[in-house]
């Protein structure tokens, strides 16, 4: 008999999920969207003897890279940096014209995190005293991260805040790609001894 299930969940900044009031103070939630989808499937290959199971899950999350805007920005906003919009545009244009470097946006952009993983497992009841399990796990993920806040000489600060703004392409991507395979034998050697 094959058994399985499919699932999907979603969260975003909709008022269904996120409030707009904190102890009497109105708050505006940043835009985000998260989708989780997956399925599982399991079945005996040989009744009461050999079984197989698998599952898959993927997660996609988009969230603001920054909620700050520059002074003079057409976007406006509640968190305004003292850095001028015109200066950021001029710097981006200079970097492209002089070096061919695309800085990316400096406000109003999103970061994306994506993850995909699956597992395959088999269980073999060899006999009353021995059970063998084999499993394989595969996980791939990418997460866009804003520029590091590590301070340089002179106590510089590179992250977007009141005194500074950074471009999206100043950030980096963390990749977490993992593969794992396990073969496990559980044996009952005697009533008091197991491996």
PLM feature spans:
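Acidic, glycine-rich flexible loop segments
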Residues: 1-177, 191
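Short, intrinsically disordered, charge-balanced linker/junction segments flanking boundaries
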Residues: 187-195
């Amino acid at each position: 008999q094959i058994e399985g299930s499919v699932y999907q969940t979603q969260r975003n900044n909709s008022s269904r999920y996120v409030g707009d009031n904190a102890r009497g103070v109105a708050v505006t939630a940043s835009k985000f969207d998260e989708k989780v989808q997956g399925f599982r499937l399991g079945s005996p290959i040989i009744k009461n003897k050999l079984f197989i199971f698998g599952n898959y899950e993927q997660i996609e999350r988009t969230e603001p890279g920054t909620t700050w805007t520059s002074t003079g920005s057409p976007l406006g906003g509640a968190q305004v940096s003292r850095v001028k919009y015109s200066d950021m545009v001029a710097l981006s244009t200079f970097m492209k014209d002089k070096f061919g470097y695309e800085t990316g946006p400096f406000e109003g952009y999103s970061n994306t995190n994506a993850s995909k993983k699956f597992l395959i497992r088999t269980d073999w009841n060899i006999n009353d005293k021995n059970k063998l399990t084999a499993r394989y796990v595969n996980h791939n993920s990418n997460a866009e991260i804003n520029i590091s806040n590590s301070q340089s000489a002179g106590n510089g600060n590179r992250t977007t805040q009141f005194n500074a703004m950074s471009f999206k392409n100043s950030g980096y991507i963390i990749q977490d790609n993992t593969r794992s395979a396990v073969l496990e034998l559980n044996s009952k050697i005697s009533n008091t001894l197991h491996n």
